[in-house]
Each structure stands twice: as structure tokens, then as C-alpha cells.
């Protein structure tokens, strides 16, 4: 019997665990890959935010937006405004990868995803020197 106060996302997670046959080693490796994606993203987020504030006319990344949106989406808009459209697209791709790694527990994160995160971090940070 399911308790009335169990959030639906926890039930989804429990069902997911029941349907998987993970070994301890596989789970540990996926945790490492998720950590790599998250740390690569967050270091890039801080680097890009600092670059925008140093190279743009505003004192806050959100000043580039007409509507109240989060900082992560605001960074994409700010990069577009500062003529860094290619980096804006890469950053948006990085956001999607980070969301999958950090919030979507049913998404399998592989070493290939971790390497992609490192590549995106390297490309974006080097382009904004």
C-alpha cells in the first residue's frame, strides 16, 4: 500500500529501481559520470557568468532578459546579445545535459556523456577568454 504523503517522483524512482538490475559497480560508475557532468557544467556556468559581467553593459545577467527567468537561461540570452551565438547554442546543449545528469534519475548517464560535458566546458571556456 502506498502512503498518501509519498511524492509521485519518489514512486517513479522506486519503480525504476525495481525494474533495473544494477550491480554496485555500474551504479557507482554512473554516479561518477553524473558528478563529472555537474562539476563541468557548474565551473562553466561561473566562468561564463563572470565573462558576461566583465564584457557586457549590465551588472546582472538577468538584465539581458525582458521576462523573469532563471540565471541559466538568462546566460544563453546574454551570450546571444553579446554576439556569441555559437557559444549560446553550446551552452543551451550543456544545460540539457546537466539537467539530465542532475535531475532525471531515469536517464542513463554514460562515460560518453561525461566526456561530452568536459568537451563542452573546454570549448565554451576557451572561446570566452
Which role fits each region the language model picked out?
Residues 1-129:
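Terminal alpha-helical segments
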Amino acid at each position: 500500500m502506498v502512503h498518501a504523503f509519498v511524492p509521485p517522483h519518489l514512486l517513479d524512482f522506486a519503480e525504476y529501481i525495481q525494474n533495473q538490475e544494477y550491480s554496485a559497480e555500474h551504479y557507482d560508475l554512473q554516479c561518477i559520470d553524473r558528478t563529472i557532468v555537474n562539476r563541468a557544467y557548474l565551473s562553466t556556468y561561473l566562468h561564463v557568468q563572470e565573462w558576461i559581467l566583465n564584457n557586457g553593459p549590465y551588472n546582472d545577467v538577468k538584465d539581458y532578459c525582458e521576462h523573469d527567468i532563471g540565471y541559466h537561461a538568462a546566460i544563453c540570452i546574454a551570450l546571444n546579445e553579446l554576439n556569441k551565438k555559437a557559444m549560446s547554442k553550446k551552452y543551451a546543449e550543456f544545460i540539457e545535459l546537466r539537467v539530465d545528469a542532475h535531475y532525471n534519475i531515469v536517464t542513463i548517464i554514460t562515460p560518453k556523456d561525461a566526456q561530452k560535458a568536459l568537451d563542452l566546458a573546454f570549448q565554451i571556456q576557451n572561446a570566452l577568454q
